[in-house]
Amino acid sequence: MARSTGSSSERPDSARAGGLTRAYLDYASFAPVDPRVVAVMRPFLEGGAGNPSASHSLGLEAKASLDGARAKIARLVGGTPAGVIFTASATEANNLALKGFAARASGRHLVTSVVEHVSVLNSCRELEKRGFTVAYVPVDGEGRVDPDAVARAITDDTALVSIQAASGEIGTVQPIAAVGRLVRGRGIAFHVDAVGAVGRVGLSVDECAIDLLSLSSNDLHGPPGAGALWVRPQTKLSPLIVGGAQEQGFRAGTENLPAVVGMGVAAELARVERATESARLATLRDRLLDGIVATVADARVTGPRGAGRLPHHASVVVPGVKADAVLMDLDLRGIAASSGSACSALTGEASHVLRAIGCDGSAAEGSLCFTTGRWTTAAEIDAVLDILPAVVTRLRRLAGA
């Protein structure tokens, strides 16, 4: 299946699911790696590089490649290259941001929201066990944080505010710049989990007064197993992983050079292609949401519509069916989608995000999430709209709904 934009004409095989898939709409769980990224990574995987900490020529070349990737990622978020710390994932970056900062902070109070990624929420819960207090700010019916509610939650003992840039489960873009303006100048650090948003919506660490920002490589169509935390100069952190002095002492262990180089290329492509690709994906998103609401009785969009939503994200709740049954039926017909966050799905628990926006248990059971990406076509959207209504009708009939 050919992609519609850019210079890479061939869709990666990983998006095909063994040749069956007619529509791959689970990019938030795994984004196929861009072939342009793979091409740059290949020499590093085939033995053409050294250790970036070594002093010989291959090591110096490896360090130059590492620093080049750092610069590309910094350009994507408008930050300084020296602030980029490479990690193995955005989850690790979130853990380092919260627990690493808390270990050096004088204050013992944190502010976050009830809809954060589980890596942020579970880090906060772990800090609570260590004697910190945490304020969990509620959201409105579309999952949006009120900056004034964040301001009201701040105390004289607040050390850190952590608010995601956007929800990976319902697509809500948060008012990060407004929160940053409230935090700026109060001696409080501001952390943003930017997974899902960076490369799709404009985000600048300086304009939004961000001190710590977490990124995922795969979310940018880079290789999995790589992430980064951007840290503003003079922001103090304690490492979670100790050993050597790699990554300025913040993250020990030899860097995964092929993955890091790939992440740098992915970041550069995302920066250059963001405006055009986001507009294309927003059109597909609206086509899908409008079509589902029009053809599936009682289907309701979760999260906002329009500019307040991530351009690649469409999520709905469908009463009278269970998401697992719908997804299995869709999969048998060549459509890959999800019920929300892949990380949360592993627990088998009801979505904390859906609970936060007022979806009760029965409604949450019918939560479906479709996320698009660089190779998504209008034909794939139409395949979902052709198949989903009949799937829901059949399952409702079987359930007696």
Name each model-derived stretch.
Residues 1-401:
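Pyridoxal 5′-phosphate
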